[in-house]
Amino acid sequence: MKKNRAFQTVVLLLFVAVQASAQKTGIPLVYSVENTGAKYDAPRFATPSQLPSVSTLPNPFVFSDGKKEVKKFKQWMKRRAEIAQEIQHYEIGQKPSVPMDSIDARMNGDTLIVDVRMNGEVLTLKTPIFYPQEGTAPYPLMIGASNNSLPAKLFKDRNIAMMVFFERQVNNYSQFGRPSGRGNYEFDRLYPDLTENGAYSEWAWGFSRLLDGLQKLGPEVTKIDMKRIGVTGCSYAGKMALFCGAFDERVALTIAQEPGGGGAAAWRVSRTLGNVENLDKTDYNWFKHSLKENFGEEKVDNLPYDHHELVALCCPRALLLLGNPDYEWLADPSMYVSANAALKVWEKFGIEDRFGYSIVAQHGHCQLPPSQYPEVEAFLDKFLLGKTDANTLVRIAPADYPQRYDVRPWMAW
C-alpha cells in the first residue's frame, strides 16, 4: 500500500517555511470578479498553419508574442488572461461575459433561481442549496459540477453548504440519451452566433451565472460566503469542474477528480501514451470541432499552449487534482507531467501550498478511497475554512512515476 501511495514530497520543515512565505506574499486567495483579465486586449491569434511546432510543453511564463516573460505576479495576471483567451479561441469556444444588470436572482425557500437575460431571450437556472445543520452563516459552499462525487460527509462534518450545477439547464449534451445537438441548446438561444462552441465553454458560462446570482443576492439572503466557494466534479464533470474553476476567479478552491484527457492531462504528453483519451480520441461535443482539424495527430505540437496552462489558470487560487491510475484511459501519467509543469507557476510566486495532486490506485472510478481523504480534507480546511495550519503540500503519485514519466524532458524552460 505504501508503494501505491509512495512518492510524497512533504517535509515538515519545508511545509512550515512555505506556510510562512505564502502568508507574507499578500497574493489574494480569491477574487470578487469573474475575470480579472477582462481589461486586457486579446493577443493576436495566429492561424494554425502559422504556429510554430513545439514538441515540449510551452513555457507558461512567456507572453504570446514571445518577447516578454513573466517576472512578477502582476505580469502573471496579464499572461493568465492571454492563456484563457487562447484556450477559448483554439479549443472550447467563447465564454461570453454577462453584465450584472442582465441577471435576476431570487431564493424560493432554499432553492436559488437565476434568470439570465441576453439578446431578448431568458435562460433560467435552478438549484437547491443544502445548508449545514450547525455552524453560523454565511457558510462556505462546495458546488458539484453535474453532481458531487466526493463523500458528503467531508462537507457535512465541516459545516460546508452544498449545491449542484445542473449543466443540462445550459447545454444538455450527454453521451447517453438524446441531447438537443450543437446549435440547439438553451445557451444557443441567447448566443445564436456561438454555435461552434464546445460544451465546456457553455457549461463554464452557466456555472458563472450561478455565482452571479449568489453575488447579486448577497450573503444576507443566500447565507453563502462568496470568498469561500469551491467546485468539484469527476470524470467528464472533473473536466467541467476544472474549466469552471479556471475561468471564474471567484472560485477559491477547485477539486478536479479523475478528469482524464481534455482535463488536467497535457495533449502533447497523452499522444505518447497507449490507449488513453487524447486530442484524437475524445468527445468533440465538448470541444470545438476545429480543434481536431487544426491540431490532430502530430499537429498537436502546434498548439500555442497545453493543459498544464489550463491548470495554471487557477493560480493564485487553490487547486487539487485527484487521479486513479487503475484506469488507463484517464491518462494519469500525462496529468502527472502536466501537474508538475503547472506547479512551477505557483512555486514562482511562493504559494506552492495552494496546489496539489494525489494519484492513488485500488479504487473504483469516481469513488474516493479513504486513503485520499486526508488530501481533500486538508484543502477544504485551508481554503474553505481558513485553517492556515492544514498541510496542503500534497505531491502523491505511484512510486514508479518519477522515473517512468520524467517531467524534465517536457520542460525546456
How does the language model describe each region?
Residues M1-T25:
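Bacterial Sec-dependent N-terminal signal peptides
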Residues Q23-K126, Y131-A137, C315-R317, N324-W413:
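Alpha/beta-hydrolase-fold serine-hydrolase catalytic core, especially in secreted/extracellular enzymes
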Residues G144-K227, G260-G263, W267-V269:
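Cap/lid segment of the alpha/beta-hydrolase catalytic domain
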Residues G233-A237, A241:
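Gly/Ala-rich beta-loop-alpha elbow adjacent to hydrolase catalytic centers
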Residues F247-A252:
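Conserved hydrolase catalytic core segment
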Residues A256-L310, A331-A339, E347-E352:
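Mobile cap/lid helix-loop segments that gate and shape the active-site cleft of serine hydrolases
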